[in-house]
Amino acid sequence: MTPLRQFSMTPLAKKGANPTMPGSFGRRARPVVLAWALPLLLGFVFLGAAATSAQAQVGSITGKITDESGDPVPFANVFIKGTQLGGTANAEGKFTIIKIPVGTYTMTAKSVGHAPIDKTVQVNANQVSTVDFKISEQAVKMKAVDIKGDIKIAIRKKDSSTKQIVTSEDLRSLPVDNYKEAIGLKAGVISQGGELHFRGGRGDEVLTIVNGIASRNPLRAEGVDLGLLAVSSSEQVMGGLDAQYGNALSGVISLTTREGGDKFGGEIRYFTDRYGEADKSFNNFERLSTGFGGPFLFPKTNYFISFEGTYTDTYLRNTATHQEHRFLNFIRLGNRQSNSAKLSSKLTFKLTPNEKLNLEVIKNQDLIGEYQNRWNRAGFVQVRHDSTAPTDGNVSTRYGAWSYFQVDSTYVPVNTAEHLPVNTEDYLQTALTWKHTLGVGTIYNLRASRQQWNSSRDVLDRMPWEYQQQPNNYYDFTNRVDGAYYVTNGDYPFYERKKTVTWTLNGDFSKKVGSHNLMTGGDINYNDFGFLRTSYPNVVTGQGLYGADRDEFRAFNPEGSFFMQDRWEYEGMVLNAGVRYDEFSVGNQISSAEVRDRTKSQISPRIGIAYPISDRDVMSFHYGRLFQVPDRQYIYQGRLFSATSRGNPNLEPQTTISYQLGVQHLFSKDIYGQFGVYFKDIFGLLTTVEQEIPGFAITVPTYVNADYASSRGVEFTLIKRFSHGFSGEVNYTYGNATGTASDPNRALAAAGNLRDQFKPTSEQPLNWDQRQNISATLGLGNEKDWRASFVYQFGSGFPYTPHEREERRQNPDLINSKRLPSVSTLSMQGERFFRAWGQSLTLYVQGTNLLDGENISDLEPTNWPDGAINPQAYNIYYTETGRAGGAFLTQDQDGDGREDWFPVHDPRVFAQGRTIRVGLGVQF
């Protein structure tokens, strides 16, 4: 990647200067997203990188030891090779080993007078792997037999939290593009606009943890993404968070990445929709992914590397042109409208049977072009010259009439989509983990990491002073019945740079003492932020800075936490109790006159009870007080007078008080059910109010802790593991999520809109308040020949606020008072296994939204500049006619004395339609 040219955040000496300042943000290089991935991928094959699973990522092994006649072998010994984990079978030959870190192990069973036997077993997070041994009475040495233990469902008899599991096999077989889509199928989760809402909470209230390290950008609460082949398992803690989890109001997504085994192996996958004739399901989609690993160059060392590159023009394809590159002469890779590359590498050093050192590197890059319906015209525009308007003597160029063809010499080519911003996201994590097993039930973990997020939003990689804009934001008005309503303003006038660097050191220690399982730990974080956002970036303000409405800051802050928890087993009942202490400092960048307390702290108790009614039933209850520090941009932003809103260094942590009651029932060895009821009260949420800037007689909208919300609901999950040729899962949620606002900027938007000046005085449905949601999956096939997975989703309508044409003031009671139509999708993935040229091959066919349903996803997408066509015009059109897709008002066509609607058919209003992809996989 080429060096970045820097620009200053200090006043300019003169207009047009190109200042530099080390350490500032600068022009980013915009390479093909795949360009950096291939050299790194080859390099990591030889260098490696890795991290261990978090302490919370453990499972259990159970089984029975019998002799050749089927009789139990009492008191036989069973242990896991290379560790100090093991146990002794009871008088019936049954054994259980708990708290085993996720991974693949070799187990040995032996008894006096019997030959030892080995079996290989895969341990998954919070699941029980069953391994039965049949040992021979002949005293002979037997070879190891590689038999993977069958994963059977087991109820969590000691757990008072509600959890949902997504395995690596789920991610391979389901028709999903990422792990978040798989999580969105679970009970208690509502997926809307790319965000996951756990039990009615906001989308930024879910914490993502990767191998025991929190991976969420503290500036704006975005989590890390991983390729499908990089994930070993995903555990979602929906409720009942123990004290080890903090800074999350709604839930936790805990991801475990894959490790290399003792033998080299892996797979390559390629998916595309580029086949046959292009139709409306053709999105110019291609995905190339691989995951492979095995022993490394040194003894007791393993590695695993995964890469996933996804390139597509999406169903929101604009008219911009993109440079295309070929790979292997038939695979066409980036740059397209949406380009994504994810690289994960993991290196594991097993120093001794009880000590393991891990190094992990994760590198992601996304390059995504925007779609705006009114900035999506390729054709010709008439040029007009105006020499009277300018005061500097120069001739002003303005664009006027538009045409698909060149009418005469006054018409010049224009492609407005190429003047839209491109969003770039870069993420890099390096993590080092040390795991030490001191003895049976005694383990400690130490982790250190550095994470960096870089993001930008600009046009054609231009610096602020390079933007090109037309005077007075000139664009064609809607006086033409052919609907040629477009923007010829020049470059889309917004520019943004963000950077976050987070250093983390955390650890935990657990020990079993009698009937108590004790755990303690903590973490220390140091954050470094840089932020610049401006509109009209080529405008120079009176302070000599580029950009109107300029918002800029550089900030540093430390924070940390400490927790203690105990799992106490007493006469069949299990008490999970803990307490957590969190501390946060705003740093020293803000003057003392504005800060009441630079350091804030809170104590959050957690208590839960699990009561096994029988070996098939468990009841549980949990109470928790949860805190979350607001996104740091709401603390530090708006330090310049030109900013439209101002951060508040005196913000308090947002708070949730949650209760839940759960029941687990094991119907059979293959069928499991889970039922839960939850109640959540959330307060201290962010909104804006007008406040005076200290020392100045002006007021600015300032973020405060004033909003509140609540959610109630019931959840039901029924799982059937694969047996007798099929598997299935049903998840149902009935929930009610209400509050005073759905977004911290709701009041800010209302202040700038005469229609919405009145704020609600009571709780109303939140934007993601989908009262009923059901998902059902069905898996068919066999391991030898074929497999097919079907996914059906149904959700009741999301709320929306109706608007009327002559409305002057919005009645606050009408906010989210109406409901959109229900949504539903049917998707599938089919796989056919065969062998060719000595390799295992798989043919794939994947289809999403097979019924091609028109599901409304966003009734009011952003439009700039507003003019006569704006988000509320879309809303008014839907309110009056019941038709979605957007429209603007034009002259009276039917003679009734009122302006008539002209539809614009904005595809952003709807979710993606039917897509069909085919693929090929190679396993080795």
Residues covered by each model-derived region:
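Periplasm-facing N-terminal accessory domains of Gram-negative outer-membrane beta-barrel systems
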Residues: 54-150
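Periplasmic N-terminal accessory/gating domains of Gram-negative outer-membrane beta-barrel systems
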Residues: 115, 121-130, 143-242, 247-252, ...
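Outer-membrane beta-barrel signature, preferentially recognizing the C-terminal barrel domain
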Residues: 184, 416-427, 434, 498, ...
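C-terminal beta-signal and adjacent terminal beta-strands/loops
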Residues: 785-789, 793-806, 832-924
